[in-house]
């Protein structure tokens, strides 16, 4: 009778027990009353001991009633183990349950499934799921929730979604488990999709829902939706939960809205370490280094930072170049008891290096018993930053001797060293090691090698690497095209550009900034226009650098109007923009427009630099505006206080020389405060040849050879002057000197774009397409020109030939004439022609082209090394000032 009376009291006492000692006293009472064999009280004791983290006591209770014939007891002990993280034991007792004569019920499986999830044992989880299906418990809400949670935790989201979809009834736990699974495994779009489905149901999200879905909003950068979720959190009151506020802070930092993140942080009633860590690390990711460090230092008494936060702040000291602060953080870590693993020491090396203390950085490195790849990379990077490239190379060699594992970062750093030092031997050694270790498979390493070989003058090796690669990425193509442009191999550069356009690689702004100058150099107008259309499609036209490149491209492709149109449409202009437009007008002999543009530039508030004055004096020179050009030179010195460089003096000499003021040019040279170089005298020499002042030409030629005997361009210019004077001994001496020094002159060639093809011609070329027809066409033109009084100028023949016919043959075979004849043969009558030449047009070709334009009734635009010439009706736009 006493037992029956005492049972309800003991049951209530067990349920309300608040600590372990109280529970033990009640347990003793249960034993004294003989109730310890009761399944009911044993089950409650097992549950209560597990609640107080005493699974051993739970097991002891279970053993007193073994063999258990009631599933309630089995469920209690399995739940006790699972609840306390003893997942193997939980599954062990589930196995024993299966071996007994007792059948599991629907309450058994949530704890068993939790154990499978805790062990990440998908195979066991699938087996349990099959048993659930066999027993018909799959429709139970709690079993379904446990299965969704298990598969979600394991990242088996397809299975989780399948279980979720098949559940006849779902509660908030079901939705939360699935949302959390998708979000925690980076499937943010799916997480948002499930969240929106939840909002459309009758179930109201809670704090767990919000905290689970916040990372999805942040990572997908859906700002408006994220702000809407913040509003829901405020309205529903879940923002009072610290984990929700932490998620909101993280979300706004992902949105790059640190002000909003800080507002949420400041309004939090309760903050934990995660709150501070999130804010500090978020500032660092946004490169708000000072704010991050300030928050860390000001709140050290409010929270305990984790290792990630302290390490991040320590790294920030390197960015701030604050060595004393770094030492303070380091001492804090020691006092706080942080274990200084290699990661922290690697950061220390990096910080000391950035602060310029390589001695301490090396001491930290040398003191490390276990150095990993990051350690080596950190110290090597430090020496590279400090400019001690040789020590960086020594460390790499030491690394190889010690058989330490180098990674792609190591190779990228050392390849940059070999590039900076132009050390091809070391670079080839890196390449060889990279092939052996398999590092060269890394795309960034291959790109760096392409760049290294190109900058060391081995473009062929760059192209070999490129051809052995797969598709590569945008950087790959940009690097190869840039290499071709740098070394003047425009034909290959064009081929690579065409290949890139046919590939699936998406160009970036750097692509356009390297291909547009190439089109400008080649005067590849059609390709330039296609690239312009392409950059419009990708939205780059409004970029300032792109606008500047387009102005240059169109101006050098013979499309001055297009250059002007691009210039007018630009919403922003810098000094480069104005310089490009002024130079463009100069190339076409539009000196007045160049001066107007210069005046507009001054009115706009842009202060001209030294390069602008080179462009404006150049424009005046090619337009015969001597007084205006001299005025600009004086303005540069007196008004803008720019000290003239040799280039400015060369422009003024050219200005005077082109206007046949040769004596004034020489006077100007004599008055120069700096010693004139060959470029100064070259302008005078060209003017002498044009005017026929061969006495001055001979004197100037001697000066040029004395000043720069190794430059093929200046040497050939002097040689041609001596040839015009018929001083063949001087010509022979110059050519022998160049030959002995293995110096070769740039061969002259011209090209013309007809249809979609570019046709290139060299002087005397008889292997070109339609060669026979070209020469026949020229013969007809020469006979017509003779009637106009044309006589070939023998001064343009630089070889010692006695036969006049031989001289005539050489002159008549100049490359620009072949290109013009080809254009006449392959275009409709009256169609304007555009021919490009890599060298300066000779006087005889200039005269011939004027006559051809008159005879055939066509405009012929020729770009040579100096400027554009528009030939029309027997005249040239340069007015014979070229």
From Swiss-Prot:
Keyword 4Fe-4S on entry: no
Segments of this protein annotated with the region Type E motif: 680-755
Record region (Type E(+) motif): 756-786
PPR repeats: 3-37, 38-68, 70-104, 105-139, 140-170, 171-205, 206-240, 241-271, 272-307, 309-340, 341-371, 372-406, 407-441, 442-472, 473-507, 508-542, 543-573, 574-608, 609-639, 645-675
Keywords on record: Repeat
GO biological process: RNA modification
GO molecular function: RNA binding; zinc ion binding
UniProt region (Type DYW motif), positions on chain: 787-882
Family: Belongs to the PPR family. PCMP-H subfamily.
Identification of the protein by name: Pentatricopeptide repeat-containing protein At3g03580
Name of the coding gene: PCMP-H23
């Amino acid at each position: 009778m006493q037992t029956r009376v005492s049972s309800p009291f003991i049951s209530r006492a067990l349920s309300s027990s608040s600590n372990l000692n109280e529970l033990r006293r009640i347990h003793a009472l249960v034993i004294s009353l003989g109730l310890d064999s009761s399944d009911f009280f044993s089950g409650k004791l097992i549950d209560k001991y597990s609640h107080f983290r005493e699974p051993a006591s739970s097991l002891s209770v279970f053993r007193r009633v073994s063999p258990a014939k009631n599933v309630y007891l089995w469920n209690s002990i399995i739940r006790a183990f699972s609840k306390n993280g003893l997942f193997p034991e939980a599954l062990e007792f589930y196995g024993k349950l299966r071996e007994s004569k007792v059948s599991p019920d629907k309450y058994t499986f949530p704890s068993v499934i939790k154990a499978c999830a805790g062990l990440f044992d998908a195979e066991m989880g699938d087996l349990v799921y099959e048993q659930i299906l066999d027993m018909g418990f799959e429709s139970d809400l709690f079993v379904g929730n446990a299965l969704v949670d298990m598969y979600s935790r394991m990242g088996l989201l397809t299975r989780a979604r399948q279980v979720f979809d098949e559940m006849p009834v779902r509660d908030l736990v079901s939705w939360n488990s699935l949302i959390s699974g998708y979000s925690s495994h980076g499937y943010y779009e799916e997480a948002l999709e499930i969240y929106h489905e939840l909002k459309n149901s009758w179930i109201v999200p809670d704090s767990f829902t919000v905290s689970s879905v916040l990372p999805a909003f942040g990572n997908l950068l859906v700002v408006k939706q994220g702000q809407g979720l913040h509003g829901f959190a405020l309205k529903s009151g879940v923002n009072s939960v610290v984990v929700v506020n932490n998620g909101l802070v993280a979300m706004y930092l992902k949105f790059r809205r640190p002000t909003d993140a800080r507002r949420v942080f400041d309004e939090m009633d309760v903050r934990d370490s995660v709150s501070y860590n999130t804010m500090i690390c978020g500032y660092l990711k946004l490169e708000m280094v000072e704010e991050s460090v300030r928050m860390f230092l000001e709140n050290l008494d409010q929270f305990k930072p984790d290792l990630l936060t302290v390490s991040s702040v320590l790294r920030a000291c390197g960015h701030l170049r604050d060595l004393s602060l770094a030492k303070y953080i380091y001492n804090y870590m020691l006092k706080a008891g942080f274990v200084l693993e290699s990661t922290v020491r690697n950061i220390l090396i990096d910080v000391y290096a950035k602060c310029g203390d390589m001695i301490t950085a090396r001491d930290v490195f040398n003191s490390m018993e276990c150095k990993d790849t990051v350690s080596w990379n950190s110290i090597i990077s430090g020496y590279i930053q400090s400019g001690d490239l040789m020590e960086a190379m020594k460390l790499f060699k030491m690394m190889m001797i010690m058989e330490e594992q180098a990674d792609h970062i190591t190779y990228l750093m050392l390849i940059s060293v070999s590039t900076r030092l132009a050390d091809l031997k070391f670079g080839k050694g890196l390449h060889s090691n990279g092939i052996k270790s398999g590092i060269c498979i890394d795309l960034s390493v291959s790109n760096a090698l392409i760049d290294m070989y190109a900058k060391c003058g081995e473009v062929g090796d760059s192209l070999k690497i490129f051809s052995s690669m797969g598709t590569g990425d945008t950087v790959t193509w940009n690097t190869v095209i840039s290499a071709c442009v740098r070394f003047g191999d425009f034909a290959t550069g064009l081929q690579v550009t065409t290949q890139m356009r046919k590939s699936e690689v998406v160009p970036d702004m750097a692509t356009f900034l390297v291909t547009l100058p190439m089109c400008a150099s080649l005067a590849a107008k059609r390709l330039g226009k296609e690239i312009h259309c392409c950059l419009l499609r990708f939205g780059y036209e409004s970029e300032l650098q792109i606008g500047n490149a387009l102005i240059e491209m169109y101006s050098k492709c013979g499309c001055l109007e297009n250059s002007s149109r691009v210039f007018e449409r630009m919403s922003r202009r810098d000094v480069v923009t104005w310089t490009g437009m002024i130079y463009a007008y100069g190339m076409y002999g539009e000196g007045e427009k160049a001066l107007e543009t210069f005046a507009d530039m001054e009115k706009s508030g842009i202060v001209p630099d030294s390069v602008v004055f080179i462009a404006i004096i150049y424009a005046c020179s090619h337009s015969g505006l001597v007084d205006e050009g001299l005025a600009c030179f004086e303005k540069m010195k007196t008004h803008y206080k720019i000290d003239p460089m040799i280039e400015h003096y060369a422009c003024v000499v050219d200005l005077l020389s082109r206007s046949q003021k040769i004596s004034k040019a020489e006077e100007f040279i004599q008055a120069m405060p700096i010693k004139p170089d060959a470029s100064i005298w070259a302008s005078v020499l060209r003017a002498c040849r044009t005017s026929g002042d061969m006495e001055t030409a001979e004197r100037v030629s001697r000066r040029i050879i004395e000043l720069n005997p190794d430059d093929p361009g200046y040497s050939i210019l002097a040689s041609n002057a001596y040839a015009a004077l018929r001083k063949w001994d001087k010509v022979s001496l110059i050519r022998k000197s160049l030959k002995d020094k293995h110096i070769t002159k740039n061969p002259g060639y011209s090209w013309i774009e007809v249809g979609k093809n570019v046709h290139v011609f060299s002087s005397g070329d008889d292997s070109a397409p339609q060669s026979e027809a070209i020469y026949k066409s020229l013969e007809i033109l020469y006979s017509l020109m003779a009637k106009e009084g044309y006589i070939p100028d023998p001064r343009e023949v630089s070889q010692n030939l006695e036969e006049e016919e031989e001289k005539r043959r050489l002159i008549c075979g100049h490359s620009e004439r072949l290109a013009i004849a080809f254009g006449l043969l392959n275009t409709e009558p009256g169609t304007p022609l555009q021919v490009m030449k890599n060298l300066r047009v000779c006087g005889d070709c200039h005269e011939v082209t004027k006559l051809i334009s008159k005879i055939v009734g066509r405009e012929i635009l020729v770009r040579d090394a100096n400027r554009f010439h528009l030939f029309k009706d027997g005249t040239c736009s340069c007015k014979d000032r070229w």
